[in-house]
Amino acid sequence: MKTRVAMLFGGKSVEHEVSVISGIQAVMNMDTDKYAVIPVYMTKRNEMYIGEEIGKIESYKNIDELLKKSQRVIMTNEDGKVFLTPFPVKMFGGKKAVEIDVAFPVVHGTNVEDGAFQGYLKTMGIPFVGCDVTASAIGMDKYIMKAVLKECDVPVLDAQLYTLSDYAQIEILLDKVEKGLGYPVIVKPVNLGSSVGISVAKNRVELTHSVDDAFKYATKVLVEHAITNLREINCSVLGDENDAIASECEEPLHTKDILSYEDKYVSNAKGSGSKGMASVSRKIPAELSPEKREEVRELAVRSFKALGCNGVSRIDFMIDEDNGKLYFNEINTIPGSLAFYLWEPVGVPYKELLDRMIFEESPHRGETDLYL
């Protein structure tokens, strides 16, 4: 009997569209000899829909029409079994509920990748793929993540955290940044991904604009020292906090001081189909010395374990070209395209990657949780 996998994507997030691409990519690459895959689209109100059109990327050109052709469902637990139950529930004559064995969230950003959705799945009692609630939450909060990694001797850049109350006295905030960090700095919403709301500031005027922009997306903002002569290197990790391996390294190419949301998704969507992060301009493998490559891969595994991660994550690093120092930048606990393009060069095809993410159980996450 095939394992019934609910592949969930979309959701209430600014990275909604990116998640749709990642989710459908995963659906298309599942081993259908082993798995019965149920694509589940979550709207921007987190309503769940299933149906024949849900797994087709071309259907998302008109969401209203897609939803009319599809069935809204809710997740229910009956006697320890989890179902996707048609909603509204009808006592007689309604459509049959679909039983699922495993939930596979392919969601990105706040409200879905930050532990909130993982907590929902845990409450429902459904085994799920990937990081647990704690690791997901820490991985999304850049400030807490830095604090944890600093305690584990992982090199991170100096940073300052500001809240809305600090923003109300912005001149004092600007003074603190100038005194404590100096220019240039990078300003980031504390809990968003895909470079949303992130910008570089090289003077007080730019810093004011950057802070204004970041607070449009979050109630907390991180300001950190910016490396002038920067090189970005990414590496994926597969495993758990006890046993993990690193992928090949990549160097993403971009048009500005930092890799923007447009670099990652928008520019590549024009004429390139639904490739998501797989279509970003990059060098694979990154041009690194054997020693630096192994340093990146070792630090990626160490960071992954320190944060208590499971499944597949992508870790983004920075190299200061002036002194060769390597710094942890951020982790994506559910990376765009599940970072499959970093595993293929080391002999792990996408189908095998998905299989390994689903099928191994951990005694540390309870009877209902799955991870790699």
Language-model segments: which ranges?
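ATP-binding N-terminal substructure of ATP-dependent carboxylate-amine bond-forming enzymes
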Residues: 1-134, 138-140, 144, 162-172
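Short acidic-glycine loop/turn motifs at beta-strand connectors
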Residues: 43-46, 239-242, 320-323
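Active-site nucleotide/adenylate-binding loops and adjacent lid/helix of ATP-dependent enzymes
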Residues: 5-9, 13-28, 93-98, 138-229, ...
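Hydrophobic beta-strand scaffold residues
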Residues: 37, 127-128, 156, 185, ...
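ATP-dependent carboxylate activation and anion-phosphoryl transfer catalytic cores
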Residues: 3, 8-12, 287-372
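Glycine-rich phosphate/pyrophosphate-binding beta-alpha loops
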Residues: 108-109, 195, 252-255, 332-344
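Phosphate-binding site of ATP-dependent enzymes
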Residues: 199-275, 287, 291, 295, ...
